[in-house]
Design a protein with these regions (language model features):
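Periplasmic c-type cytochrome electron-transfer domains
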Residues: 5-7, 20-451
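Bacterial N-terminal signal peptides
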Residues: 9-18
């Protein structure tokens, strides 16, 4: 597992970066720009990402079917793909996700009668299977050296191969996302039996979903093909989660960006503007103090002063304390997982509640997080979530009270420098991730509509 890199005290690197960034942009790039940039990259542990292991084709095929099948949801109305669509780069382009009972699809989807938004944005699943230690925006699932920490504790079945499979166990247990409420009926008017299981009965929920799947002959055949040494009586939802993880690993790993090619010593892979942005990223802008390592993030948590929008969670509704919602994590109030930045250009809107639609807005926020939070204009929010903005003085003060130390002072980036940072972030895009429509199957074993 990659360690979390802390910003090194390398005065020589800092001086070199400062000198390069100060270069007059009306002239040719300095001849040593690549040497300076590579020195900075090395200082923050940014290395080429290793290829993921090839996955068994039958396992991937099963995982693909499960990912797109609404049979996994209590009301049979949503699938994993409802919030993680190929057409929106494996997210949903919504500021806040809309789970079971919603109306419409994609960016236009809204909560149905008696429903509300899921408290957080649906993050992209691109590159989710690369080996990041923390899953979900609050990191409530962790995976280190083959050992997992999850909300289910000892109820988590053995045999899960990786943290992505562990994560795949949980959306089906969440009432707002997929399971539904007691008294719900499914799309056929039948009682939602998954919703009748108690919230703490993890095993009961997973058994109920598995029972549904194994009532479909095509799934029985698909499970037998993917797990030939496991009898139907031994199958559990952990096998479904393993297949979903294999699908994500095989099909959603996209690591051939210009920056990846630059890491492999192709100096021409980045434009001069992108190189200037990279020097800012690893220098004056201090982005790399959080976004470091092979994935440029994903290895820690921070309160970065994001405006609070949404219905909130259990601890202090309507606020969302992020990692501070988890027991024993009071220090992390309003802190969320530091996002890995691969393909970030394609994954708007940004932050845990989707308050910013563009990377330019994100960079502007980081340039002076305190001011940006206190002057945030809710009119920039989509109208249907505008009423869930919590901009009172008490809330803003609470967020600022836990603001990460690296954002206490403005960065004082010029407009040109901010544009260069955005250009660098665009260099993290794998062109193959722009069109993922081929991942969507025409049909799924349940016969339900494919989202």
């Amino acid at each position: 597992m990659y360690r979390r890199f802390i910003r090194p005290s390398l005065s020589g690197v800092a001086l070199a970066l400062g000198a390069c960034v100060a270069t007059d942009r009306n002239f040719t790039e300095p001849v040593n720009v690549d040497a300076q940039l590579r020195q900075a990259i090395d200082a923050y542990g940014v290395v080429p990402i290793a290829a993921v292991p090839a996955q068994d084709s039958a396992l991937v095929a099963l995982g693909r079917a499960l990912f797109f099948d609404r049979e996994l949801s209590g009301n049979r109305d949503v699938a994993c793909a409802t919030c993680h669509q190929p057409s929106t780069t494996m997210g949903d382009a919504q500021p806040l996700a809309v789970g079971t009972g919603g109306v419409g699809s994609g960016p236009s989807r809204t909560p149905g009668p008696g429903r509300t938004y899921v408290p957080r944005n649906a993050p992209t699943l691109l590159n989710a299977a690369l080996g990041l230690p923390y899953v979900f925006l609050d990191g409530r699932i962790t995976g280190f050296n083959g050992s997992f920490t999850t909300p289910a504790g000892g109820a988590l079945p053995a045999g899960l191969p990786n943290v992505v499979a562990a994560q795949a166990m949980f959306p089906v247990t969440n009432r707002r996302e997929m399971r539904g409420e007691a008294g719900d009926t499914d799309v056929f008017g039948r009682s939602n039996e998954l919703a009748l299981v108690g919230d703490s009965d993890w095993t009961g929920i997973w058994q109920a979903v598995t029972k549904r799947l194994l009532a479909i002959p095509a799934y029985v055949n698909a499970f037998q093909a993917a797990f030939p040494n496991t009898s139907p009586s031994q199958l559990g939802f952990q096998h479904a989660a393993t297949a979903i993880a294999a699908f994500e690993m095989q099909q959603l790993t996209r690591t051939d960006s210009p920056f990846d090619r630059y890491l492999k010593r192709d100096d021409a892979a980045l434009t001069p503007e992108q190189k200037r942005g990279a020097l800012l990223f690893f220098g004056k802008a201090t982005c790399s103090s959080c976004h470091n390592g092979p994935f440029l993030g994903g290895q820690g948590f921070a309160d970065v002063g994001v405006p609070q929008v949404g219905p909130g969670l259990a601890t202090q509704p309507p606020l969302d304390l992020g990692r501070g919602e988890l027991p024993g994590n009071d220090f992390y109030q309003f802190a969320f997982r530091i996002a890995p930045l691969r393909n970030v250009e394609l994954t708007a809107p940004y932050f845990h509640d989707g308050v910013y639609q563009t990377l330019a807005q994100v960079v502007h926020h980081y340039n002076d997080a305190r001011t940006d939070l206190t002057t945030f204009d809710p009119a920039t929010l989509r109208q249907d979530v505008r009423g869930m903005y919590h901009g009172d003085a008490t809330t803003i003060a609470a967020v600022l009270n836990h603001l990460d130390f690296r954002l206490q002072q403005p960065l004082r980036l010029t407009a040109t420098e901010q544009a260069e940072l955005v250009a660098f972030l665009h260099s993290l895009t794998d062109a193959s991730a722009r069109d993922l429509s081929a991942l969507r199957p025409a049909t799924v074993p349940s016969g339900l509509p494919v989202p």
